[in-house]
């Protein structure tokens, strides 16, 4: 079992990492989110979160980011390793309830795991 923290090594930090995901990765959609996914050379899954100003003011954008981080933190063990994932919030995410956001994230990660099967047995 891994620790439930969201360490620096688990995050996408550099601009070129985000760009690389969308130039050479694949995308999956859910009702409130879009995700770019690309295989990495690390031994861990890494997450990036993008919420543009078009989605809402800072407090609303931060709330969405907190929900994404928390979902990732709790469900990281169920996801395949060696992937970079950038989750982008759609405008619909602002008005969604926490339950809707969680359902949408579950759908997104389910689609991504179907698209990219786990290396683990």
Swiss-Prot record:
GO terms for biological process: tRNA 5'-leader removal. It catalyses: Endonucleolytic cleavage of RNA, removing 5'-extranucleotides from tRNA precursor. GO terms for cellular component: ribonuclease P complex. GO terms for molecular function: 3'-tRNA processing endoribonuclease activity; ribonuclease P activity; tRNA binding. It is an enzyme of class 3 (hydrolase). Its EC number is 3.1.26.5. The keyword RNA-binding applies. This is Ribonuclease P protein component. It comes from Desulfosudis oleivorans (strain DSM 6200 / JCM 39069 / Hxd3) (Desulfococcus oleovorans).
